[in-house]
């Protein structure tokens, strides 16, 4: 087993991740989805991770060449980044999501944008998605035009592209424009998760409640699978905030999404946030991806622009 990297931060309640061969899945939980069988086996020879990047594209230092329509003002620096080793192909798993089969914890770190800190000019968000050992699993890059970002701010519609170690887009998250006021339950928030891009595998929809933030995780047929329930006050000072992942009857807790406290200075002057996700190891891979989408929706709904 590879030791954690020096400086790797694990939030409270998150145990170190063990090799898949040494871990058995947790007991069954109420409301757990089952595996589907409509995906083909990815081709063998899936390329392994790279220790660093030497190929750059215009405006995207550190990435292999890609044709993604990402805004040119973004700069992503990932030189000398340690990536999670590429797992073997898995039956009935969307290409690029094999990593999630070996993971029961994810850490999401939003990059601090100096331009945004100094000028208040809203830029496209960029996130690092790591496992509990600090190894990079994915990178998430927002793709939104300047006018939309600065006019709609946290309520803006966006496309979030999830890239692997080769710079290939393995997931796409689409959030439509909807009124974010809690007084209008007819305009509840939602996000669509696609893997591969263009193929919906699930949705996250807001469930109206007068006091609590609630989300419903759905499969590709829009059938309800899991619930996410947050605290009455989603913004607290000097402490982590837990959004519990529960069964549909909200009785059994199977995981959580944690907004981690980043310190007074970072919280006060930036909207750069850190999150942790914990879910069962044997949860269906596509529902793990939908849970990741729920984390990003929570960030934009409750914490984006809260500095």
Curated annotation (Swiss-Prot):
Record topological domains on the Cytoplasmic side: 1-286
Motif SH3-binding 1, chain ranges: 11-20
Entry GO CC: cytoplasm; membrane; nucleus
Similarity comment text for this entry: Belongs to the phospholipid scramblase family.
Distribution of this protein across tissues and organs: Expressed in erythrocyte membranes, blood platelets, blood leukocytes, T- and B-lymphocytes, vascular endothelium, spleen, thymus, prostate, testis, uterus, intestine and colon.
In-chain residues carrying the UniProt-annotated modification Phosphothreonine: 159
Region (Proline-rich domain (PRD)): 1-82
Catalytic activity of the protein: a 1,2-diacyl-sn-glycero-3-phosphocholine(in) = a 1,2-diacyl-sn-glycero-3-phosphocholine(out)
GO MF annotation: an example: phospholipid scramblase activity
Cofactor(s) this protein requires: Ca(2+)
Motif segment (SH3-binding 2): 82-89
Intracellular or extracellular location(s): Membrane
Any Gene Ontology biological process: plasma membrane phospholipid scrambling
Residue intervals passing through the bilayer: 287-303
Residue numbers spanned by region Disordered: 1-37
Protein name: Phospholipid scramblase 2
Alphabetical keyword list: Calcium, Lipoprotein, Membrane, Metal-binding, Palmitate, Phosphoprotein, Repeat, SH3-binding, Transmembrane, Transmembrane helix
Entry keyword Transmembrane: yes
Ranges of Low complexity composition bias in the record: 11-27
């Amino acid at each position: 087993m590879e030791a954690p990297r020096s400086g790797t931060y694990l939030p409270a309640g998150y145990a170190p991740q063990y090799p898949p061969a040494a871990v058995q899945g947790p007991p069954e939980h109420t409301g757990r989805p089952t595996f589907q069988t409509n995906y083909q086996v990815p081709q063998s020879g899936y390329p392994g991770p790279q220790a660093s990047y030497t190929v750059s594209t215009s405006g995207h230092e550190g990435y292999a060449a890609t044709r993604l329509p990402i805004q040119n003002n973004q700069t992503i620096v990932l030189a000398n980044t340690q990536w999670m080793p590429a797992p073997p192909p898995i039956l009935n798993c969307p290409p690029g999501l094999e990593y999630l089969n070996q993971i029961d914890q994810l850490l999401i770190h939003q990059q601090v944008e100096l331009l945004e800190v100094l000028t208040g000019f809203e830029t496209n968000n960029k996130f690092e998605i790591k496992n509990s050992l600090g190894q990079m699993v994915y990178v998430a890059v927002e793709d939104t035009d300047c006018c939309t970002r600065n006019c709609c701010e946290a309520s803006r519609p966006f496309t979030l592209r999830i890239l692997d170690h080769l710079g290939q887009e393995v997931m796409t998250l689409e959030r439509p424009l909807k009124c974010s006021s809690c007084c209008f339950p007819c305009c509840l928030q939602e996000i669509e998760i696609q893997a591969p891009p263009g193929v919906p595998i699930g949705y996250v929809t807001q469930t109206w409640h007068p006091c609590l933030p609630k989300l419903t995780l759905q499969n590709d047929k829009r059938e309800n699978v899991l619930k996410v329930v947050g605290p009455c006050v989603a913004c607290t000072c000097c402490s982590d905030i837990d959004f519990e992942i529960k069964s549909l009857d909200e009785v059994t807790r199977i995981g959580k999404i944690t907004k981690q406290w980043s310190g007074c200075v970072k919280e006060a002057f930036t909207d750069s946030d850190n999150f942790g996700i914990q879910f069962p190891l044997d949860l269906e891979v596509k529902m793990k991806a939908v849970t990741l989408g729920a984390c990003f929706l929570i960030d934009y709904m409750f914490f984006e622009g809260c500095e």
